[in-house]
Curated annotation (Swiss-Prot):
GO cellular component, one term: cytoplasm
Stated name of the protein: D-amino-acid oxidase
Binding site residues for FAD: G18, V19, T46, T47, S48, A52, A53, V162, S179, R277, G303, G304, G306, T308
Protein species of origin: Rubrobacter xylanophilus (strain DSM 9941 / JCM 11954 / NBRC 16129 / PRD-1)
pH dependence (record): Optimum pH is 7.5-10.
Keyword field contains Cytoplasm: yes
């Protein structure tokens, strides 16, 4: 298609409208692409909408590239946190260590306000912990902000299911594949697998700091306060495809979280959700050519770090798309 003064505008189709897809679509639009997002469900029904969304690298590899993408995303979020309309804020929290020796985490240089926990700050059973400041995104507001920003810049969202990347890219100059766990089918990638995460939202009893307790012997545990609620988690069930919340799992999550934070006992439950994190041995962010010759940038396999890596990966994906057409 043509833009002002007859300039040819490259057409990009982004597959997927979770945080990876919307961020990539915005990055493409800011590079001058005409952008159309194609997705099977609206943003509020994606895995991203289920996320507790603390900046924290989780189940994403390799570490060196994850650190680079994550640091860039942290930088962008720091700017977004200045605008309350984005749903992003900088929050203080703690990661608890029960098995690991409290050395230096590999992601330390990406965060601010880092320090080791003092002994009196630790709950029973913990060998150590870290306090740090990190972005927290309230995903309903943040996804709405991203979609509004994309549409305000001239991008569009089309809700329909596609059976292949070739179908999605009909009429486009480049495809950007941000299909999450569904890349197993669309990209014909058997290395992609679901990591099921279940959470519940409860009324916030006055909590301000997030708590991450990955090594809890009773199961993965995290508490993420937001403006009007708390997200309590969670699970990391590899290979399980169900997005139906399990009542027994919800009870166990609430029990673990209440043991860490007694103020959660009796908290009013607002919602149960489950989503499928896109697991993969490594994040796939690379260019390939689809049958028929259309270039395709793959951007998936972020594990539990979709929000954490979103802008770093989006900008690199947009750069790859630009290079493919140059």
């Amino acid at each position: 298609m043509c833009g002002m003064r007859g300039r040819v505008v490259a057409r990009a189709v982004v597959v997927g409208c979770g945080v990876a897809g919307l961020s990539a679509a915005i990055a493409l639009r800011e590079r001058g692409f005409g952008v159309r997002v194609v997705a099977r469900e609206p943003p509020e029904r994606t895995t991203s909408a289920v996320a507790a969304a603390v900046w924290y690298p989780y189940r994403a590899y390799p570490e060196e590239r994850v650190l680079s993408w994550g640091a860039r995303t942290f930088e962008v979020f720091r700017g977004l946190a200045a605008d309350p309309r984005t749903g992003v804020r900088l929050g203080e929290g703690v990661e608890l260590l029960r098995r690991s020796a409290p050395g230096e985490p590999w992601w330390r240089e990406a965060v601010s306000g880092f320090r080791r926990c003092r002994e009196e700050e630790l709950p029973p059973g913990c060998r150590g912990g870290y306090r740090f400041v990190a972005p927290v995104a309230e995903m309903p507001a943040y996804l709405a902000y991203l979609l509004d920003r994309l549409r305000g810049a001239g991008g569009t969202l089309e809700l329909r299911e596609v059976s292949s990347l070739e179908e999605a890219g009909e009429g486009a100059d480049v495809v950007v594949n941000c299909s999450g766990v569904w890349a197993r089918e669309l990209a014909r990638d058997p290395s992609v697998f679901p990591i099921r995460g279940q959470i519940l939202r409860v009324a916030n009893p006055g909590l301000e700091r997030f708590v991450l307790d990955e090594e809890n012997p009773a199961g993965l545990t995290y508490i993420v306060p937001r403006s009007g609620d708390c997200v309590l988690g969670g699970t990391a069930e590899e290979g399980r495809w169900s997005t139906e919340p399990d009542p027994a799992t919800a009870e166990a999550i609430l029990r673990r979280c209440s043991a860490l934070e007694p103020r959660l006992r009796g908290a009013r439950v607002l919602e149960h959700r489950a989503g499928l994190r896109p697991g993969r041995p490594e994040v796939r962010l690379e260019l390939e050519e689809l049958p028929g010759g259309t270039p395709c940038v793959h951007n998936y396999g972020h594990g539990g770090s979709g929000v954490t890596l979103s802008w770093g990966c989006a900008e690199e994906a947009a750069a790859l798309a630009g290079a493919a057409l140059s």
